[in-house]
């Protein structure tokens, strides 16, 4: 994140000698109460001396558990919090995969702690439409705003013949690529798809036999992912898993390239993807394979929407610029935050 100044804070070693460390951090942590533990960690953080004499006009936190540190910085400055999904869901999932000493913190307990802290804010900013809708219901008394995050744009050309999937190795991406290789790729034999990103290692670990069958499609980690988008004639978004906004989907939108995608790729966005002229929406593997095979036989470069000039003015590019560009983010944040600092 760009910043004019950066300061770092952490808990001093002396905190371990305090009884409050054991009661507010250690005890909740061993029972899986990450919500209370992480909030206590920021409460005990030692703030830099250089900030002591500064006047704080506004505090923008990117997680609810930063609120104690924010209030140590200023007890009165307007406080804006980005919710970053329902953290209680993430904590509950984390507890599924680790050893937790009973009694384990329940989802309801984790959520109540999260909401307790969020009620301290003056404004809640939600980064996707699903999240915004959720918190409108959970905290209807709060001021809730939908502001999509700024996502770095991908190049819009010159385009080419390549059909690509871009995917990192997180679990939802791995499952989505697995679905594509099991159910779509065998039905589209003319499509020579290139899969860029470190999803190759994740799939190899999860499904070695499937990876071996299709390993010729994988490029692995690519230093210049922009070049992948720039030279693509068609981008695939075979998304079947995940929640919250898909950053890879936003990157693909910004490239302006023709897309074949599942509805799940557009999760968290207030848009009907069927209204985007350069998007072919497919709700099942058969439809995805049919669209992909037809595009491969025709040749991606023959699509009039695949050239650099067409990509610059495509529907997905316009949607990106209006919602996910740095200018769009700055404008929306300014409009909702300005009343807090001028009241």
Language model: regions and residue ranges:
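Donor nucleotide-sugar binding/catalytic pocket of nucleotide-sugar-dependent glycosyltransferases
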Residues: 104-107, 115-154
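Acceptor-binding helix/loop patch of EC 2.4 sugar-transfer enzymes
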Residues: 10-37, 77-112, 274
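A charged, aromatic-enriched C-terminal amphipathic alpha-helix characteristic of glycosyltransferases
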Residues: 155, 303-338
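Conserved acidic donor-binding segment of nucleotide-sugar-dependent glycosyltransferases
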Residues: 277-286, 293-303
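Short hydrophobic beta-strand element within catalytic cores of glycosyltransferases
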Residues: 248-252, 258-265
